[in-house]
Structures are given as C-alpha cells and as structure tokens.
C-alpha cells in the first residue's frame, strides 16, 4: 500500500518518464500549455493546470523526446 499524500504517487509517475528531472520538465511544460489555452487531453473535473498535467502524464497521454546533445 502506498502511503503517499500525493496522488498519483511519485513512484508511479516515475514509471512513465526517465527520471525526476524529466518528470518536472514535462509536467511544467504541459501545465504552461494548459495555462496558455491548450485543450486538456482527458475529461476531468481538475481545474489546476499542474494537477491536470500530472494526471495526463500518469495516464500516458504525454510523450516527450530526450535529446542527448552535450555542450560542444
């Protein structure tokens, strides 16, 4: 049983992305898109953009690409 107060739990969200940094970046960029007027990818009563973005990540509705270019 997961005793996290955050729903969904961070451990569950980390199964959808590469690492914590990616989770923060993907979630924040998606939340910004929602604030700027993009339509939600799921039907929900959630009104907070960050909470909605987290749910979209958890449901596997958000994809991203990791670019592995370093400083040259």
From Swiss-Prot:
Coiled coil: none annotated. Transmembrane segments: none annotated. One of its GO terms (biological process) is DNA-templated transcription. Keywords: DNA-directed RNA polymerase, Nucleotidyltransferase, Transcription, Transferase. Its EC number is 2.7.7.6. It catalyses: RNA(n) + a ribonucleoside 5'-triphosphate = RNA(n+1) + diphosphate. InterPro entries: DNA-dir_RNA_pol_omega, Pol_omega/Rpo6/RPB6, RPB6/omega-like_sf. SUPFAM superfamilies: RPB6/omega subunit-like (SSF63562). One of its GO terms (molecular function) is DNA binding. One of its GO terms (cellular component) is DNA-directed RNA polymerase complex. Belongs to the RNA polymerase subunit omega family. Promotes RNA polymerase assembly. Latches the N- and C-terminal regions of the beta' subunit thereby facilitating its interaction with the beta and alpha subunits. The RNAP catalytic core consists of 2 alpha, 1 beta, 1 beta' and 1 omega subunit. When a sigma factor is associated with the core the holoenzyme is formed, which can initiate transcription. This is DNA-directed RNA polymerase subunit omega. It comes from Clostridium tetani (strain Massachusetts / E88).
